Design a protein with these regions (language model features):
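Extracellular glycan-modifying ectodomains
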Residues: 1-197
Length: 197
């Protein structure tokens, strides 16, 4: 999730320099290595992220992941820690995803002409997690990615090109399209220029 968020933001805002500190299945949350990732390397990677990388001069730290209910409290603790270091934080909220990989859903369809319509019953909406996150961490903006992805509908193709390469990750075109929508929905330059926490 974080890697294609990086791709999305880089394409939407070419005037800014973005860096990423991502690893597959390693949620960027502080001191909760038991849920921060399923691999043993996540623990050392998270220690590096939150002891070394956070000390670099950055205008903003963007946290993006597959957010679940059990990650809200450690995310809150992570935000408090980052604020204590004087860091500005933005959270990319839970995304809509699909019950099956999008290419598989398309292969089951009858034609590309109506695939966006035919997959709508395969959408998994995580807006309830977004509401819980916003309630727990009101001091930080949490972007409603589900609304951005599904404005006005949860399309999986644009013309004849895929927007997702699996259940939840954007293709390059998907990152570009969702980045365009992100830019319209959220004023990142203004957010970055607001006073630090």
């Amino acid at each position: 999730m974080a890697a294609d968020t990086y791709m999305m933001l880089s394409q939407a805002y070419p005037e800014y320099t973005f860096s990423q500190a991502t690893a597959d299945a390693c949620t960027g949350i502080l001191d909760r290595f038991d849920i921060g990732g399923r691999y043993s390397t996540c623990r050392s990677f998270n220690q590096y992220r939150f002891s070394e990388l956070v000390r670099l001069d950055m205008d903003l730290i963007v946290l993006a992941s597959i957010w679940e209910e059990d990650r809200i409290q450690p995310l809150k603790e992570t935000v408090a820690y980052l604020h204590s270091l004087g860091k500005k934080v933005l959270i990319i909220g839970p995304r809509v995803h699909f019950r099956d990989a999008v290419p598989l859903l398309i292969s089951r369809g009858t034609s590309l002409d109506n695939v966006n319509f035919s997959v709508r019953n395969r959408v998994v909406d995580r807006s309830f997690v977004l509401r819980q996150m916003r309630q727990a961490i009101p001091e930080v903006d949490i972007v409603d990615m589900g609304s951005i992805q599904c404005a006005p509908s949860c399309d999986v193709i644009d013309g004849d090109r895929l927007l997702y390469y699996d259940k939840r990750h954007f293709t390059q075109l998907g990152a570009q399209r969702f980045g365009e929508r992100f830019k319209k929905a959220f004023d990142l330059p203004t957010y970055m220029s607001e006073p630090d926490p």
